[in-house]
């Protein structure tokens, strides 16, 4: 990684599939490359769909802290040492209830993020197992901040009991309902929708933020 004449002032790095390797870690080589960029005056920004708790754990694998964290697909922006985000735009309780109702209608479940926690159901757990079979480790379910919910009633209870606002949602629908879900979500008019296809078309996911929120365009 070369930075001739300080041509670059800022380096924005995604985590999954970019900075993190198949073991869900920052390699020593990449950590050294990021540090060399910092020494040349380049600001390092970690941009990801993950929440602040997760990103801080990965930033600890770098040789020096990044300058900024853009988390939950742009819903929260802060410096690593800050207790609170400098920019924050969350989903409202009504938004979350609408997403849950849509999931119940289509017999799927979401992931819901706060800055500190991830709530997930069977669809995301199936993805984790799929990735583990291929040798990829995305997260350890036993770690602090991860909560598995296996019924609609538990989802409603989580909305009631969680004291932090939800920053984003992610759906992992089957192929046959993915396009229809995107269409319904867009029709609601309240959300920023980012559908994507992974693993050669095997997996469709839909990231949902409050309207106007994204990692950067």
What positions do the PLM features span?
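Non-catalytic pre-domain segments flanking phosphatase-related domains
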Residues: 1-13, 39
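Active-site phosphate-binding/coordination module
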Residues: 25-138
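Short amphipathic alpha-helices and their capping/turn segments at secondary-structure boundaries
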Residues: 1-5, 56-63, 184
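Conserved acidic, metal-coordinating active-site core of Asp-based
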Residues: 113-217
């Amino acid at each position: 990684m070369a930075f001739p004449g300080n041509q670059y002032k800022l380096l924005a790095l995604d985590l999954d599939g970019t900075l993190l390797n198949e073991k869900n870690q920052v390699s020593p080589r990449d950590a050294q490359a990021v540090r060399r960029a910092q020494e040349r005056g380049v600001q390092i920004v970690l941009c990801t769909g993950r929440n602040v708790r997760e990103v801080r754990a990965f930033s600890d694998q770098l040789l020096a802290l990044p300058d900024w964290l853009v988390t939950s697909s742009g819903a929260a922006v802060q410096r690593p040492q800050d207790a609170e985000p400098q920019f924050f735009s969350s989903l409202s309780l009504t938004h979350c209830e609408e997403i849950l109702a849509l999931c119940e209608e289509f017999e799927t479940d979401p992931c819901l993020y706060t800055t500190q926690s991830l709530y997930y159901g069977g669809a995301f757990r199936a993805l984790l197992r799929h990735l583990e079979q291929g040798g990829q480790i995305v997260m350890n379910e036993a770690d602090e901040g991860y909560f598995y919910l296996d019924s609609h009633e538990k989802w409603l209870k989580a909305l009631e009991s969680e004291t932090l606002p939800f920053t984003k949602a992610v759906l992992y629908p089957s192929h046959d309902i993915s396009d229809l879900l995107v269409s319904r979500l867009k029709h609601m008019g309240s959300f920023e929708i980012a559908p994507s296809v992974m693993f050669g078309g095997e997996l469709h996911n839909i990231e949902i933020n409050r309207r106007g929120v994204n990692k950067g365009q």
